Amino acid sequence: MNIHEYQAKAIFADNGIPTLKGKVAFSVDEAVSNAKELGGSVWAVKAQIHAGGRGLGGGVKIAKNLDEVKDYASKILGMNLATHQTGPEGKLVQKLYIESGANIVKEYYLAILFNRMAEQITIIASSEGGMDIEKVAKESPEKIAKVGIDPQIGFKMFHGLEVARVLGLDKDEGKKLISMIAKLYKLYMDKDMNMLEINPLIKTAEGDFYALDAKCSFDDSALYRHPEIAELRDITEENPAEREAAEFGLSYVKLDGDVACMVNGAGLAMATMDIINYSGAKPANFLDVGGGASPETVAKAFEIILRDKNVKVIFINIFGGIVRCDRIANGILEATKNVEVNIPIVVRLDGTNAAEAKTILDNSNLKNIKAATNLKNGAELVKSLVG
Protein backbone atom coordinates (compact mmCIF):
# COMPACT_ATOMS: atom_id res chain seq x y z
CA MET A 1 0.00 0.00 0.00
CA ASN A 2 1.29 3.45 -0.93
CA ILE A 3 0.61 6.71 0.87
CA HIS A 4 0.96 10.37 -0.03
CA GLU A 5 4.00 12.52 0.66
CA TYR A 6 2.18 14.59 3.29
CA GLN A 7 1.13 11.42 5.11
CA ALA A 8 4.65 9.99 5.02
CA LYS A 9 6.08 13.24 6.37
CA ALA A 10 3.61 13.24 9.24
CA ILE A 11 4.85 9.75 10.14
CA PHE A 12 8.45 10.95 9.83
CA ALA A 13 7.81 13.92 12.12
CA ASP A 14 6.15 11.69 14.72
CA ASN A 15 9.29 9.56 14.77
CA GLY A 16 11.84 12.34 15.09
CA ILE A 17 12.88 12.47 11.43
CA PRO A 18 13.44 16.09 10.30
CA THR A 19 11.04 17.49 7.71
CA LEU A 20 10.21 21.04 6.66
CA LYS A 21 6.95 22.59 7.83
CA GLY A 22 4.03 21.89 5.52
CA LYS A 23 0.26 21.53 5.31
CA VAL A 24 -2.10 19.69 2.98
CA ALA A 25 -4.63 21.73 0.96
CA PHE A 26 -7.77 20.63 -0.87
CA SER A 27 -8.57 23.98 -2.49
CA VAL A 28 -6.78 27.03 -3.87
CA ASP A 29 -7.96 29.20 -0.98
CA GLU A 30 -6.71 26.64 1.52
CA ALA A 31 -3.33 26.55 -0.25
CA VAL A 32 -2.95 30.32 0.12
CA SER A 33 -4.14 30.20 3.73
CA ASN A 34 -1.62 27.45 4.50
CA ALA A 35 1.23 29.48 2.99
CA LYS A 36 0.27 32.47 5.15
CA GLU A 37 0.14 30.30 8.26
CA LEU A 38 3.50 28.67 7.52
CA GLY A 39 5.11 32.07 7.08
CA GLY A 40 8.29 32.85 5.18
CA SER A 41 8.74 34.10 1.64
CA VAL A 42 9.20 30.90 -0.39
CA TRP A 43 6.93 27.86 -0.60
CA ALA A 44 6.79 24.66 -2.61
CA VAL A 45 3.39 23.86 -4.14
CA LYS A 46 3.31 20.08 -4.61
CA ALA A 47 0.76 17.83 -6.29
CA GLN A 48 -0.14 14.84 -4.14
CA ILE A 49 -0.45 11.67 -6.22
CA HIS A 50 0.93 8.15 -5.82
CA ALA A 51 3.67 8.54 -8.43
CA GLY A 52 7.18 9.88 -8.82
CA GLY A 53 8.39 12.36 -11.42
CA ARG A 54 5.91 15.02 -10.33
CA GLY A 55 8.35 17.87 -10.85
CA LEU A 56 9.13 16.99 -14.45
CA GLY A 57 5.40 16.67 -15.11
CA GLY A 58 4.70 20.18 -13.82
CA GLY A 59 3.30 19.06 -10.49
CA VAL A 60 5.83 20.83 -8.25
CA LYS A 61 6.37 24.59 -8.36
CA ILE A 62 8.33 27.06 -6.22
CA ALA A 63 6.31 30.16 -5.28
CA LYS A 64 8.03 33.35 -4.12
CA ASN A 65 4.91 35.22 -3.05
CA LEU A 66 1.29 34.48 -2.17
CA ASP A 67 0.06 35.43 -5.64
CA GLU A 68 2.29 32.73 -7.11
CA VAL A 69 1.01 30.24 -4.54
CA LYS A 70 -2.52 31.00 -5.72
CA ASP A 71 -1.55 30.84 -9.40
CA TYR A 72 0.33 27.54 -9.12
CA ALA A 73 -2.32 25.98 -6.88
CA SER A 74 -5.07 26.85 -9.38
CA LYS A 75 -3.06 25.29 -12.22
CA ILE A 76 -1.99 22.11 -10.42
CA LEU A 77 -5.17 21.32 -8.48
CA GLY A 78 -7.52 19.45 -10.79
CA MET A 79 -4.90 18.81 -13.47
CA ASN A 80 -4.32 15.34 -14.91
CA LEU A 81 -0.66 14.87 -14.02
CA ALA A 82 1.23 12.47 -16.27
CA THR A 83 4.65 11.19 -15.22
CA HIS A 84 6.87 8.28 -16.23
CA GLN A 85 5.17 6.26 -13.46
CA THR A 86 1.53 7.08 -14.25
CA GLY A 87 1.57 6.37 -17.96
CA PRO A 88 0.12 8.75 -20.55
CA GLU A 89 -3.32 8.72 -18.91
CA GLY A 90 -1.91 10.47 -15.82
CA LYS A 91 -3.57 10.91 -12.42
CA LEU A 92 -6.05 13.53 -11.25
CA VAL A 93 -4.57 15.90 -8.65
CA GLN A 94 -7.10 16.31 -5.83
CA LYS A 95 -4.86 17.67 -3.09
CA LEU A 96 -1.72 19.76 -2.67
CA TYR A 97 1.06 19.97 -0.12
CA ILE A 98 2.24 23.48 0.70
CA GLU A 99 5.73 23.37 2.19
CA SER A 100 8.07 26.02 3.57
CA GLY A 101 11.22 26.78 1.62
CA ALA A 102 14.78 26.11 2.82
CA ASN A 103 18.31 27.29 2.05
CA ILE A 104 19.48 24.16 0.24
CA VAL A 105 23.19 23.67 -0.40
CA LYS A 106 23.19 19.99 -1.43
CA GLU A 107 20.72 17.28 -2.47
CA TYR A 108 21.18 13.55 -1.83
CA TYR A 109 19.26 10.35 -2.49
CA LEU A 110 18.40 7.89 0.29
CA ALA A 111 16.27 4.75 0.26
CA ILE A 112 15.73 1.65 2.38
CA LEU A 113 14.28 -1.43 0.72
CA PHE A 114 14.19 -5.20 0.88
CA ASN A 115 16.76 -6.87 -1.37
CA ARG A 116 15.23 -10.24 -2.15
CA MET A 117 18.26 -11.50 -4.06
CA ALA A 118 20.60 -10.83 -1.13
CA GLU A 119 17.93 -11.61 1.50
CA GLN A 120 18.86 -8.39 3.28
CA ILE A 121 17.60 -4.91 3.95
CA THR A 122 19.55 -2.55 1.69
CA ILE A 123 20.28 1.13 2.16
CA ILE A 124 20.84 2.92 -1.13
CA ALA A 125 22.37 6.38 -0.97
CA SER A 126 23.81 8.76 -3.53
CA SER A 127 25.40 12.19 -3.65
CA GLU A 128 23.24 12.85 -6.72
CA GLY A 129 19.81 13.60 -5.25
CA GLY A 130 16.71 14.89 -6.98
CA MET A 131 17.53 12.77 -10.04
CA ASP A 132 16.52 9.45 -11.55
CA ILE A 133 18.53 7.01 -9.43
CA GLU A 134 18.55 4.42 -12.23
CA LYS A 135 20.27 6.94 -14.48
CA VAL A 136 22.86 7.72 -11.80
CA ALA A 137 23.50 4.00 -11.27
CA LYS A 138 24.14 3.56 -14.99
CA GLU A 139 26.27 6.65 -15.60
CA SER A 140 28.04 7.16 -12.24
CA PRO A 141 27.89 3.95 -10.17
CA GLU A 142 30.73 5.16 -7.94
CA LYS A 143 28.35 7.82 -6.58
CA ILE A 144 25.99 5.22 -5.13
CA ALA A 145 26.37 3.36 -1.84
CA LYS A 146 24.58 0.04 -1.42
CA VAL A 147 24.83 -1.14 2.16
CA GLY A 148 23.33 -4.51 3.09
CA ILE A 149 21.92 -5.05 6.58
CA ASP A 150 21.19 -8.43 8.15
CA PRO A 151 17.74 -7.98 9.76
CA GLN A 152 18.85 -10.13 12.71
CA ILE A 153 21.69 -7.69 13.43
CA GLY A 154 20.00 -4.44 12.46
CA PHE A 155 21.45 -1.06 11.58
CA LYS A 156 24.86 -0.39 13.15
CA MET A 157 27.33 2.50 13.14
CA PHE A 158 29.56 0.88 10.51
CA HIS A 159 26.61 0.79 8.09
CA GLY A 160 26.09 4.52 8.55
CA LEU A 161 29.80 5.30 8.23
CA GLU A 162 29.88 3.65 4.80
CA VAL A 163 26.94 5.78 3.66
CA ALA A 164 28.59 8.94 5.00
CA ARG A 165 31.85 8.06 3.25
CA VAL A 166 30.23 7.65 -0.17
CA LEU A 167 28.27 10.88 0.30
CA GLY A 168 31.46 12.75 1.16
CA LEU A 169 30.27 14.04 4.54
CA ASP A 170 32.52 15.42 7.25
CA LYS A 171 32.47 14.08 10.82
CA ASP A 172 29.71 16.34 12.17
CA GLU A 173 27.53 15.92 9.08
CA GLY A 174 28.05 12.16 9.23
CA LYS A 175 26.87 12.01 12.84
CA LYS A 176 23.67 13.88 11.99
CA LEU A 177 22.89 11.72 8.98
CA ILE A 178 23.68 8.44 10.75
CA SER A 179 21.29 9.42 13.55
CA MET A 180 18.62 10.14 10.95
CA ILE A 181 19.19 6.84 9.10
CA ALA A 182 18.96 4.91 12.38
CA LYS A 183 15.50 6.40 12.98
CA LEU A 184 14.46 5.70 9.38
CA TYR A 185 15.60 2.07 9.61
CA LYS A 186 13.68 1.54 12.85
CA LEU A 187 10.58 3.08 11.30
CA TYR A 188 10.98 0.92 8.17
CA MET A 189 11.12 -2.26 10.26
CA ASP A 190 8.49 -1.29 12.84
CA LYS A 191 5.89 -0.39 10.19
CA ASP A 192 6.53 -3.38 7.87
CA MET A 193 7.48 -1.24 4.89
CA ASN A 194 8.46 -2.55 1.49
CA MET A 195 10.24 0.66 0.60
CA LEU A 196 11.15 4.01 2.10
CA GLU A 197 12.58 6.63 -0.26
CA ILE A 198 13.72 10.23 0.21
CA ASN A 199 14.57 11.99 -3.03
CA PRO A 200 15.91 14.46 -2.38
CA LEU A 201 17.35 14.39 1.08
CA ILE A 202 18.66 17.92 1.52
CA LYS A 203 21.46 19.57 3.48
CA THR A 204 20.84 23.19 4.42
CA ALA A 205 23.32 26.03 4.82
CA GLU A 206 23.14 25.38 8.56
CA GLY A 207 24.40 21.82 8.02
CA ASP A 208 21.10 20.14 8.89
CA PHE A 209 19.43 17.31 6.95
CA TYR A 210 15.75 17.20 5.99
CA ALA A 211 13.52 14.85 4.03
CA LEU A 212 12.38 17.14 1.22
CA ASP A 213 10.34 14.33 -0.32
CA ALA A 214 9.03 11.14 1.25
CA LYS A 215 7.72 7.98 -0.32
CA CYS A 216 6.61 4.97 1.74
CA SER A 217 5.19 1.66 0.59
CA PHE A 218 3.80 -0.85 3.09
CA ASP A 219 3.38 -4.62 2.99
CA ASP A 220 -0.34 -5.22 2.40
CA SER A 221 -0.14 -8.55 4.21
CA ALA A 222 1.04 -6.81 7.40
CA LEU A 223 -1.53 -4.01 7.49
CA TYR A 224 -3.61 -5.88 10.07
CA ARG A 225 -0.81 -5.06 12.51
CA HIS A 226 -0.97 -1.35 11.66
CA PRO A 227 -4.58 -0.11 11.58
CA GLU A 228 -3.30 3.46 11.83
CA ILE A 229 -1.45 2.93 8.53
CA ALA A 230 -4.35 1.12 6.86
CA GLU A 231 -6.53 4.17 7.56
CA LEU A 232 -4.26 6.24 5.31
CA ARG A 233 -5.24 4.29 2.17
CA ASP A 234 -6.47 6.59 -0.61
CA ILE A 235 -8.64 4.43 -2.83
CA THR A 236 -8.99 7.23 -5.39
CA GLU A 237 -5.31 6.69 -6.23
CA GLU A 238 -5.79 3.00 -6.95
CA ASN A 239 -6.80 1.45 -10.25
CA PRO A 240 -10.59 0.85 -10.00
CA ALA A 241 -10.35 -2.53 -11.74
CA GLU A 242 -7.53 -3.68 -9.45
CA ARG A 243 -9.50 -2.54 -6.42
CA GLU A 244 -12.65 -4.34 -7.56
CA ALA A 245 -10.66 -7.50 -8.29
CA ALA A 246 -9.17 -7.45 -4.79
CA GLU A 247 -12.67 -7.33 -3.29
CA PHE A 248 -13.36 -10.69 -4.98
CA GLY A 249 -10.05 -12.24 -3.93
CA LEU A 250 -8.44 -11.75 -7.34
CA SER A 251 -4.92 -10.40 -7.87
CA TYR A 252 -5.13 -8.20 -10.97
CA VAL A 253 -2.64 -5.78 -12.47
CA LYS A 254 -3.40 -4.07 -15.78
CA LEU A 255 -0.64 -4.01 -18.40
CA ASP A 256 -0.44 -2.56 -21.90
CA GLY A 257 -0.64 -5.67 -24.10
CA ASP A 258 -3.50 -7.35 -25.97
CA VAL A 259 -3.56 -10.89 -24.51
CA ALA A 260 -5.62 -11.16 -21.33
CA CYS A 261 -4.38 -13.83 -18.92
CA MET A 262 -6.40 -15.75 -16.35
CA VAL A 263 -4.21 -18.08 -14.30
CA ASN A 264 -4.18 -19.74 -10.88
CA GLY A 265 -1.06 -19.09 -8.84
CA ALA A 266 1.34 -16.15 -9.06
CA GLY A 267 4.25 -18.30 -10.26
CA LEU A 268 2.26 -19.85 -13.09
CA ALA A 269 0.83 -16.43 -13.94
CA MET A 270 4.33 -14.98 -14.34
CA ALA A 271 5.45 -17.99 -16.38
CA THR A 272 2.39 -17.54 -18.60
CA MET A 273 3.23 -13.88 -19.15
CA ASP A 274 6.84 -14.81 -19.95
CA ILE A 275 5.88 -17.35 -22.59
CA ILE A 276 3.37 -14.94 -24.14
CA ASN A 277 6.17 -12.39 -24.47
CA TYR A 278 8.51 -15.08 -25.80
CA SER A 279 5.96 -16.01 -28.47
CA GLY A 280 5.91 -12.41 -29.71
CA ALA A 281 2.61 -11.31 -28.17
CA LYS A 282 2.14 -9.02 -25.14
CA PRO A 283 0.15 -9.74 -21.95
CA ALA A 284 -2.64 -7.29 -21.14
CA ASN A 285 -2.68 -8.11 -17.45
CA PHE A 286 -1.52 -10.20 -14.55
CA LEU A 287 -4.49 -12.08 -13.10
CA ASP A 288 -4.25 -14.75 -10.41
CA VAL A 289 -7.64 -16.25 -9.54
CA GLY A 290 -6.11 -18.03 -6.54
CA GLY A 291 -6.52 -21.54 -5.21
CA GLY A 292 -10.11 -21.17 -4.07
CA ALA A 293 -11.59 -19.89 -7.32
CA SER A 294 -15.33 -20.41 -7.72
CA PRO A 295 -17.49 -20.03 -10.84
CA GLU A 296 -18.55 -16.63 -9.48
CA THR A 297 -14.98 -15.33 -9.11
CA VAL A 298 -14.04 -16.62 -12.55
CA ALA A 299 -17.06 -14.82 -14.00
CA LYS A 300 -15.98 -11.62 -12.23
CA ALA A 301 -12.46 -12.07 -13.63
CA PHE A 302 -13.92 -12.27 -17.13
CA GLU A 303 -15.95 -9.14 -16.54
CA ILE A 304 -12.88 -7.19 -15.40
CA ILE A 305 -10.50 -8.22 -18.17
CA LEU A 306 -13.09 -7.65 -20.90
CA ARG A 307 -13.36 -3.98 -19.92
CA ASP A 308 -9.91 -3.53 -21.42
CA LYS A 309 -10.67 -2.63 -25.04
CA ASN A 310 -7.11 -3.54 -26.10
CA VAL A 311 -7.69 -7.23 -25.39
CA LYS A 312 -7.84 -9.38 -28.54
CA VAL A 313 -7.46 -12.86 -27.02
CA ILE A 314 -8.06 -14.40 -23.59
CA PHE A 315 -5.61 -17.07 -22.44
CA ILE A 316 -6.87 -19.22 -19.55
CA ASN A 317 -4.09 -21.35 -18.08
CA ILE A 318 -5.14 -23.45 -15.10
CA PHE A 319 -3.28 -26.19 -13.30
CA GLY A 320 -5.76 -27.91 -11.05
CA GLY A 321 -4.07 -28.55 -7.74
CA ILE A 322 -6.20 -26.90 -5.10
CA VAL A 323 -8.58 -25.30 -7.58
CA ARG A 324 -10.68 -27.75 -9.62
CA CYS A 325 -10.67 -27.41 -13.39
CA ASP A 326 -14.42 -28.07 -13.60
CA ARG A 327 -15.03 -25.00 -11.43
CA ILE A 328 -13.06 -22.92 -13.90
CA ALA A 329 -15.02 -24.38 -16.81
CA ASN A 330 -18.32 -23.59 -15.10
CA GLY A 331 -17.02 -20.10 -14.40
CA ILE A 332 -16.32 -19.62 -18.11
CA LEU A 333 -19.89 -20.65 -18.93
CA GLU A 334 -21.27 -18.36 -16.20
CA ALA A 335 -19.26 -15.46 -17.58
CA THR A 336 -20.48 -15.94 -21.14
CA LYS A 337 -24.09 -15.83 -19.91
CA ASN A 338 -23.64 -12.38 -18.39
CA VAL A 339 -20.92 -10.85 -20.56
CA GLU A 340 -20.81 -10.96 -24.33
CA VAL A 341 -17.49 -12.49 -25.38
CA ASN A 342 -16.69 -11.84 -29.03
CA ILE A 343 -12.98 -12.59 -28.92
CA PRO A 344 -11.16 -15.95 -28.99
CA ILE A 345 -10.50 -17.81 -25.75
CA VAL A 346 -7.55 -20.18 -25.55
CA VAL A 347 -7.94 -22.64 -22.68
CA ARG A 348 -5.32 -24.90 -21.16
CA LEU A 349 -6.68 -26.96 -18.26
CA ASP A 350 -4.62 -29.64 -16.54
CA GLY A 351 -4.82 -31.42 -13.21
CA THR A 352 -7.79 -32.02 -10.90
CA ASN A 353 -11.00 -32.75 -12.84
CA ALA A 354 -9.43 -31.66 -16.15
CA ALA A 355 -11.38 -34.33 -18.06
CA GLU A 356 -14.66 -33.16 -16.54
CA ALA A 357 -13.79 -29.58 -17.45
CA LYS A 358 -13.10 -30.55 -21.06
CA THR A 359 -16.49 -32.28 -21.24
CA ILE A 360 -18.24 -29.20 -19.84
CA LEU A 361 -16.62 -26.93 -22.44
CA ASP A 362 -17.16 -29.41 -25.30
CA ASN A 363 -20.87 -29.55 -24.50
CA SER A 364 -21.24 -25.80 -24.15
CA ASN A 365 -21.52 -24.92 -27.85
CA LEU A 366 -19.11 -22.02 -27.32
CA LYS A 367 -17.56 -21.57 -30.73
CA ASN A 368 -14.77 -19.15 -29.84
CA ILE A 369 -12.97 -21.49 -27.41
CA LYS A 370 -9.79 -23.22 -28.55
CA ALA A 371 -8.18 -25.94 -26.43
CA ALA A 372 -4.41 -25.96 -25.89
CA THR A 373 -2.57 -29.21 -25.21
CA ASN A 374 0.19 -27.57 -23.16
CA LEU A 375 1.61 -24.16 -22.22
CA LYS A 376 3.79 -23.82 -25.31
CA ASN A 377 0.93 -24.79 -27.61
CA GLY A 378 -1.30 -22.28 -25.82
CA ALA A 379 1.18 -19.46 -26.41
CA GLU A 380 1.48 -20.41 -30.09
CA LEU A 381 -2.31 -20.38 -30.46
CA VAL A 382 -2.49 -16.99 -28.77
CA LYS A 383 0.14 -15.53 -31.08
CA SER A 384 -1.61 -16.87 -34.19
CA LEU A 385 -4.92 -15.33 -33.07
CA VAL A 386 -3.42 -11.95 -32.20
CA GLY A 387 -1.71 -11.78 -35.59
UniProtKB/Swiss-Prot annotation:
UniProt keyword annotations, A-Z: ATP-binding, Ligase, Magnesium, Metal-binding, Nucleotide-binding, Tricarboxylic acid cycle
PROSITE patterns: SUCCINYL_COA_LIG_3
Domain of life: Bacteria
One Pfam family matching this protein: Ligase_CoA
Job description of the protein: Succinyl-CoA synthetase functions in the citric acid cycle (TCA), coupling the hydrolysis of succinyl-CoA to the synthesis of either ATP or GTP and thus represents the only step of substrate-level phosphorylation in the TCA. The beta subunit provides nucleotide specificity of the enzyme and binds the substrate succinate, while the binding sites for coenzyme A and phosphate are found in the alpha subunit.
Family to which this protein belongs: Belongs to the succinate/malate CoA ligase beta subunit family.
Oligomer status and interactors: Heterotetramer of two alpha and two beta subunits.
The protein's name: Succinate--CoA ligase [ADP-forming] subunit beta
Protein source organism: Campylobacter jejuni subsp. jejuni serotype O:6 (strain 81116 / NCTC 11828)
Phylogenetic lineage: Bacteria, Pseudomonadati, Campylobacterota, Epsilonproteobacteria, Campylobacterales
Gene name in the database record: sucC
